[in-house]
Amino acid sequence: VPFDDETQAPEESVGDVRWSSTKIGDLAADAGIGRIHVLAWRDLDDVEAGGSELHASAVAARWAAAGIDVVMRTSHAAGSPPRARRDGYEVVRHAGRYLIFPRAVAAELLGRHGRRDALVEIWNGVPFLSPLWARGRRATWLHHVHEDMWPMVLPPKLARAGQLLERRIAPPFYRRTPIVTLSESSRSHILDRLRLPADNVHVVPPGIDPGFSPGTEAP
């Protein structure tokens, strides 16, 4: 998303990130991928952000360091500007917790975030249903099946609707979409509960931030 002088995005940082970006850049160049759009429910600056948001931000930062243009579209985060730049990638925060889904899709269809070479959808309970409208390279990140979590965050009727959407309505549309999850246990649960083709569900371990290192033994 281009910024003019009046809406120049502030620089934000989530800490020191150290890695070699050469291999990522080479892989992207060979695949003809120079610009990636990411659709996410929440931003890292959201007060309720968790592992999904941290993972998305870390990956986007590494892509940006490899020379890939990354635009991440999320819902707004209280106290944060609508647009920002964090660790080399652009963040666009518009719409509330529920309107983010139709508005993000509309923005992509209307080309408001510019061209893209690939699309990443983060399926965090409610999907963006990218297989129905996105053409070209795309993948979906699905960390886990929410299932029993719906009643914890929504009233009974809405919780049942969420469970129905996640387990029955959405999965058939994703049968030809590459699904990326973080562990073999999550993959097994996805295959069991969502009945997606095993060949399309891939495990990519998240790794460990280099800021963490083994400590000394306690005396």
Which residues does each PLM region occupy?
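Membrane-proximal helix-turn-helix segments that form the acceptor-binding/catalytic region
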Residues: 157-180
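N-terminal strand-loop element at the rim of the active site
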Residues: 14-33, 42-45, 62-96
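A short, glycine/small-residue-rich beta-strand->loop->alpha-helix junction that serves as a flexible
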Residues: 41-55
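A short, charged, and often flexible helix/loop element on the N-terminal side
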Residues: 84-114, 151-158
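A short helix/loop element that forms part of the nucleotide-sugar donor recognition site in Leloir-type
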Residues: 83-84, 209, 214-219
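A short beta-strand/loop micro-motif in the catalytic core of glycosyltransferases
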Residues: 175-184, 190, 202
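Active-site proximal beta-strand in glycosyltransferases
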Residues: 118-121, 132-152, 158-162
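Carbohydrate-associated surface elements
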Residues: 185, 207
